C-alpha cells in the first residue's frame, strides 16, 4: 500500500495542562470539529470521549493518555488534508509520569492554561518536562468566558514564571460574560463564531474601534518577533515596516520549531470559540515528524545511530504505553519513528532481546478502534498480541537492531500494604497487580520478606487509590488497604574500603570468593555505579559481574532499617580466587558481604521524600498556614501574589508530615485554601527522626 498522507502533513501533538484548565473539553471540541464525535461530550456530565476509564469519568480528571487520530483541512478548507494524532495527557500531579511518557513521543504540544487562574504549579512541571524533551509548543488560553479571565495577564505569567518567550497571534474581544470572539493579528480581522451551530461556522468582521490601537501594538510585537528569524527579514522589516502574511507565518513557524518562541492563542472551548483556530495554528506552526531531529539510539555494539522519519529506513518504534482492554487483552501503544510494518509481521524487542509478532494493529479514537493493515513512519497506533513489552521498550526490524533511548521513571514515594479479603482474591490480586505494573512504570509491587504482606508503591495517594479501585472494577479483586507509609531510602555519606570473604569447606567441592571493594556515594540520582579495577587477573573476568550483582541485590535492603539504598559507587580493586572452589555464587555472596560491612562503616543515613508544596490561601489565614507548615518541618521558600488577592506559599515539606494535610488545611481556613504537592527529591532525615524510624522497623 502506498502512503495515504504525506509525512509532511502529519502532526503528532499532545494537549497538556494543569488540572482544571479545560484540556479534555478542548480535545473534545477538536474531535467534534474534525468530524469524529457527533455529540460534544462534557466533562461535567462525565461523558467526554477522551476520558475512557470509568474512574476518570467519575472524578472528572484525565488519567490515561489515550491516543486519537483525526483529520483536518483548515477552518476554510485552505490546507490539503492533514492527519493529526492527538495524545491527551493527564494534568494531575500524581500522574506526571504519563505526561513525561507522552511528551517523549510527541513532535509538538498545545499547552492549555485557564484564563483566570493562569500559570499554576502543575503547569510549571509540564513545561519543564516539555523543555527536557525540546518539544516545540504553542499556548491556548482557555476559559476566557470565566470570571477574572485576562489573556494578557496569563501571557505575562508565561513569560515571568516559565521563563518562556510568548508571542500572542490573537487577542480576545471582550472577556468573562462579554467574551465574543478573537482578533487574528496576522489577518487583522475579528473572528466571530456562530453560537447557533456550536461554533461550526464563523465570519470575519472588522476589529472593534476601541481595540484597534491595542491590536496594532500586539501585531507589531508579533512582526518584530517574526523578523528575528533571519537577517534578511529583519532588514526588510526595518526598511519597509511590514512583512507579508506568508513571510510572517513562515518566520513564526521557524522560530517555534527552534523553541525560540511560543505562540499564544485564546478562546473558550466550552463556549465553542477559538478551537478551530488552534487547529489551524497546529497545522501552520507545529512540526511534522520530518521537521524534528532524527531520533537517536544505539546498536548492538553500543554505537550511536539515528533513525529518520522515512518509510525506506528499517522499522523502529517506541512502546510508550501499555493498556489492558477487557475485550482484546493488552494494547501496546507505539510511536513509529521509521520504516513500515504490517499486521502479522514479526518484529524484535531489542530491550528484552525477544521476538514479537503484531497480531493486529489498530488506530485508536479515544475508546473506539479501527483495524489497519500497516503503520508507517510518523504513525501512532496500538498493537494487539504482543507478549512481553513494557513501557519504553523499542520494537525494531530484526536484521537492523536498535535501542531508542530509554525513558527515566521516578522513584515512588508512598507505599501501602494490600491484603486480599479471601483465598479466591489472593490469586486474582497477583494477576491484577502484575498487569497494572506493566502498564505503569511509576507503580511498583513487592512483598515484604518479614511480614509476607504485599506492598504497592506509587507517586501519591490518588495514584494508589486509583490502582486499588481498578483492581476492584477491572479484575473484581476485593482487598483491604493499610495505612499509607512513606517510602524511605538509605544511602551513605562517607567512604569505606572493605573485604568480603566467603569460604566454605565441608567435604567435596568447597566455596571460595574473596573481594576488596571501595564504597563511596555516587552523584545524586546516578543510582548504582560499579567500577572494575581488577588488574592481572586476580579475579577472573567471568566472576566480576557476579560481584556487582551481589552488591546490587544487597542494596535492596539497607543496613540501618532495611530500606532500599540509593546512589552508591562500588569499586572492585582486589581479591583472590581458588581454581576449584570458586564459583559465580561464591563471588556474589562475597560481594554482598562486602557491601553490608562497608555500608555500616561509610556513615549510612536514612533519606525521606521531600515534596514541593504550594498552598493558595486568602491573606487572613496566611500566618496560620505558614505556622502549620513550619510545625511540619517545612522550609518556606517564597510567597507570590495569586489572583483575586490570594497568596501563594511555596515550601519544601517531608512527605511523612503531609498525611491528612487536606483535611487539616480545610478546617484551618474554613475550606478557602487549596494546595498541590509533588515529589522534589530525597533528603537526609534528621537524627532524632531517623532513630525513631529505625526503632519502629525493629533494627
From Swiss-Prot:
<keyword id="KW-0342">GTP-binding</keyword>
<dbReference type="InterPro" id="IPR004540">
    <property type="entry name" value="Transl_elong_EFG/EF2"/>
</dbReference>
<dbReference type="InterPro" id="IPR047872">
    <property type="entry name" value="EFG_IV"/>
</dbReference>
<keyword id="KW-0648">Protein biosynthesis</keyword>
<dbReference type="GO" id="GO:0005737">
    <property type="term" value="C:cytoplasm"/>
</dbReference>
<protein>
    <recommendedName>
        <fullName>Elongation factor G 1</fullName>
    </recommendedName>
</protein>
<dbReference type="GO" id="GO:0032790">
    <property type="term" value="P:ribosome disassembly"/>
</dbReference>
<dbReference type="Pfam" id="PF14492">
    <property type="entry name" value="EFG_III"/>
</dbReference>
<dbReference type="Pfam" id="PF00679">
    <property type="entry name" value="EFG_C"/>
</dbReference>
<dbReference type="InterPro" id="IPR005517">
    <property type="entry name" value="Transl_elong_EFG/EF2_IV"/>
</dbReference>
<dbReference type="GO" id="GO:0097216">
    <property type="term" value="F:guanosine tetraphosphate binding"/>
</dbReference>
<feature type="domain" description="tr-type G">
    <location>
        <begin position="8"/>
        <end position="290"/>
    </location>
</feature>
<dbReference type="InterPro" id="IPR027417">
    <property type="entry name" value="P-loop_NTPase"/>
</dbReference>
<dbReference type="Pfam" id="PF03144">
    <property type="entry name" value="GTP_EFTU_D2"/>
</dbReference>
<keyword id="KW-0251">Elongation factor</keyword>
<keyword id="KW-0963">Cytoplasm</keyword>
<feature type="binding site">
    <location>
        <begin position="142"/>
        <end position="145"/>
    </location>
    <ligand>
        <name>GTP</name>
    </ligand>
</feature>
<dbReference type="InterPro" id="IPR004161">
    <property type="entry name" value="EFTu-like_2"/>
</dbReference>
<dbReference type="InterPro" id="IPR009000">
    <property type="entry name" value="Transl_B-barrel_sf"/>
</dbReference>
<dbReference type="InterPro" id="IPR000795">
    <property type="entry name" value="T_Tr_GTP-bd_dom"/>
</dbReference>
<feature type="binding site">
    <location>
        <begin position="88"/>
        <end position="92"/>
    </location>
    <ligand>
        <name>GTP</name>
    </ligand>
</feature>
<dbReference type="InterPro" id="IPR035649">
    <property type="entry name" value="EFG_V"/>
</dbReference>
<dbReference type="Pfam" id="PF00009">
    <property type="entry name" value="GTP_EFTU"/>
</dbReference>
<dbReference type="InterPro" id="IPR000640">
    <property type="entry name" value="EFG_V-like"/>
</dbReference>
<dbReference type="InterPro" id="IPR041095">
    <property type="entry name" value="EFG_II"/>
</dbReference>
<dbReference type="InterPro" id="IPR009022">
    <property type="entry name" value="EFG_III"/>
</dbReference>
<dbReference type="InterPro" id="IPR005225">
    <property type="entry name" value="Small_GTP-bd"/>
</dbReference>
<dbReference type="GO" id="GO:0003924">
    <property type="term" value="F:GTPase activity"/>
</dbReference>
<keyword id="KW-0547">Nucleotide-binding</keyword>
<comment type="function">
    <text>Catalyzes the GTP-dependent ribosomal translocation step during translation elongation. During this step, the ribosome changes from the pre-translocational (PRE) to the post-translocational (POST) state as the newly formed A-site-bound peptidyl-tRNA and P-site-bound deacylated tRNA move to the P and E sites, respectively. Catalyzes the coordinated movement of the two tRNA molecules, the mRNA and conformational changes in the ribosome.</text>
</comment>
<dbReference type="InterPro" id="IPR035647">
    <property type="entry name" value="EFG_III/V"/>
</dbReference>
<dbReference type="InterPro" id="IPR031157">
    <property type="entry name" value="G_TR_CS"/>
</dbReference>
<dbReference type="GO" id="GO:0003746">
    <property type="term" value="F:translation elongation factor activity"/>
</dbReference>
<feature type="binding site">
    <location>
        <begin position="17"/>
        <end position="24"/>
    </location>
    <ligand>
        <name>GTP</name>
    </ligand>
</feature>
<dbReference type="InterPro" id="IPR020568">
    <property type="entry name" value="Ribosomal_Su5_D2-typ_SF"/>
</dbReference>
<dbReference type="Pfam" id="PF03764">
    <property type="entry name" value="EFG_IV"/>
</dbReference>
<dbReference type="InterPro" id="IPR014721">
    <property type="entry name" value="Ribsml_uS5_D2-typ_fold_subgr"/>
</dbReference>
<dbReference type="GO" id="GO:0005525">
    <property type="term" value="F:GTP binding"/>
</dbReference>
<comment type="similarity">
    <text>Belongs to the TRAFAC class translation factor GTPase superfamily. Classic translation factor GTPase family. EF-G/EF-2 subfamily.</text>
</comment>
Amino acid at each position: 500500500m502506498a502512503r495515504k498522507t504525506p509525512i509532511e502533513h502529519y502532526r503528532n501533538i499532545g494537549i497538556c495542562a494543569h488540572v482544571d484548565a479545560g484540556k479534555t473539553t478542548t480535545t473534545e471540541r477538536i474531535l467534534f470539529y474534525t468530524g469524529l464525535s457527533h455529540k460534544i461530550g462534557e466533562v461535567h456530565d462525565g461523558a467526554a470521549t477522551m476520558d475512557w476509564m470509568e474512574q476518570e469519568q467519575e472524578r472528572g480528571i484525565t488519567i490515561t493518555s489515550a491516543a486519537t487520530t483525526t483529520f483536518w483541512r483548515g477552518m476554510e478548507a485552505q490546507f490539503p488534508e492533514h492527519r493529526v494524532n492527538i495524545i491527551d495527557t493527564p494534568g494531575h500531579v500524581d500522574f506526571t509520569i504519563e505526561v513525561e511518557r507522552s511528551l517523549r513521543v510527541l513532535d509538538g504540544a498545545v499547552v492549555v492554561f485557564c484564563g483566570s487562574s493562569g500559570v499554576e504549579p502543575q503547569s510549571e512541571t509540564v513545561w519543564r518536562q516539555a523543555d527536557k524533551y525540546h518539544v516545540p509548543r504553542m499556548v491556548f488560553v482557555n476559559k476566557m468566558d470565566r470570571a477574572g479571565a485576562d489573556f494578557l495577564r496569563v501571557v505575562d505569567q508565561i513569560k515571568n514564571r516559565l521563563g518562556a518567550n510568548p508571542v500572542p497571534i490573537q487577542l480576545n474581544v471582550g472577556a468573562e460574560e462579554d467574551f465574543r470572539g478573537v482578533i487574528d493579528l496576522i489577518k487583522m480581522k475579528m473572528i466571530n463564531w456562530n453560537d447557533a451551530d456550536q461554533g461550526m461556522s464563523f465570519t470575519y468582521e472588522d476589529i472593534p474601534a476601541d481595540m484597534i490601537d491595542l491590536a496594532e501594538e500586539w501585531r507589531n510585537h508579533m512582526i518584530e518577533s517574526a523578523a528575528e528569524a533571519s537577517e534578511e527579514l529583519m532588514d526588510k522589516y526595518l526598511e519597509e515596516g511590514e512583512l507579508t502574511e506568508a513571510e510572517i507565518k513562515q518566520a513564526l513557524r521557524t522560530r517555534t520549531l527552534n523553541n525560540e518562541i511560543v505562540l499564544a492563542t485564546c478562546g473558550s472551548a466550552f463556549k465553542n470559540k477559538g478551537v478551530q483556530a488552534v487547529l489551524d495554528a497546529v497545522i501552520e506552526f507545529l512540526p511534522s515528524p520530518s521537521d524534528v531531529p532524527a531520533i537517536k539510539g544505539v546498536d548492538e555494539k553500543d554505537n550511536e545511530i539515528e533513525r529518520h522519519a522515512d518509510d525506506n529506513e528499517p522499522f523502529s518504534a517506541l512502546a510508550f504505553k501499555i493498556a489492558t482492554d477487557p475485550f482484546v487483552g493488552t494494547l501496546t501503544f507505539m510511536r513509529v519513528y521509521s520504516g513500515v510494518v504490517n499486521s502479522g509481521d514479526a518484529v524484535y524487542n531489542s530491550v528484552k532481546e525477544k521476538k514479537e509478532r503484531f497480531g493486529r494493529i489498530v488506530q485508536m479514537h479515544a475508546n473506539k478502534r479501527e483495524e489497519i493493515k500497516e503503520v508507517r513512519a510518523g504513525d501512532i497506533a496500538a498493537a494487539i498480541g504482543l507478549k512481553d513489552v513494557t513501557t519504553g521498550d523499542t520494537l525494531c526490524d530484526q536484521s537492523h537492531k536498535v535501542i531508542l533511548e530509554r525513558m527515566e521513571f521516578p522513584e515512588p514515594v508512598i507505599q501501602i500494604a494490600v491484603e486480599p479479603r479471601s483465598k479466591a482474591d489472593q490469586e486474582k490480586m497477583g494477576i491484577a497487580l502484575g498487569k497494572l505494573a506493566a502498564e505503569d512504570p511509576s507503580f511498583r509491587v513487592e512483598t515484604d520478606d518479614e511480614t509476607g504482606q504485599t506492598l504497592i508503591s506509587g507517586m501519591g495517594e490518588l495514584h494508589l487509590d486509583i490502582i486499588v479501585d481498578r483492581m476492584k472494577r477491572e479484575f473484581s479483586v476485593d482487598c483491604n488497604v493499610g495505612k499509607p507509609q512513606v517510602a524511605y531510602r538509605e544511602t551513605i555519606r562517607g567512604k569505606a574500603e572493605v573485604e568480603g570473604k566467603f569460604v566454605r569447606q565441608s567435604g567435596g567441592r568447597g566455596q571460595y570468593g574473596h573481594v576488596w571493594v571501595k564504597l563511596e556515594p555516587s552523584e545524586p540520582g546516578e543510582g548504582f555505579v560499579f567500577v572494575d579495577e581488577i588488574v592481572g587477573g586476580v579475579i577472573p573476568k567471568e566472576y566480576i559481574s557476579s560481584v556487582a550483582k551481589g552488591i546490587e541485590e544487597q542494596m535492596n535492603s539497607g543496613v540501618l532499617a532495611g530500606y532500599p539504598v540509593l546512589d552508591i559507587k562500588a569499586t572492585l580493586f582486589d581479591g583472590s580466587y581458588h581454581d576449584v572452589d570458586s564459583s559465580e555464587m561464591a563471588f556474589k555472596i562475597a560481594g554482598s558481604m562486602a557491601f553490608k560491612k562497608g555500608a555500616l562503616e561509610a556513615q549510612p543515613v536514612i533519606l525521606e521524600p521531600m515534596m514541593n508544596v504550594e498552598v493558595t490561601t486568602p491573606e487572613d489565614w496566611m500566618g496560620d498556614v505558614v505556622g502549620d507548615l513550619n510545625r511540619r518541618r517545612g522550609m518556606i521558600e517564597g510567597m507570590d501574589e495569586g489572583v483575586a488577592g490570594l497568596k501563594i506559599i511555596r515550601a519544601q515539606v517531608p512527605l511523612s508530615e503531609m498525611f491528612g494535610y487536606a483535611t487539616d488545611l480545610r478546617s484551618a481556613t474554613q475550606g478557602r485554601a487549596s494546595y498541590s504537592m509533588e515529589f522534589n527529591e530525597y533528603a537526609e532525615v534528621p537524627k532524632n527522626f531517623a532513630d525513631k524510624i529505625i526503632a519502629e522497623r525493629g533494627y
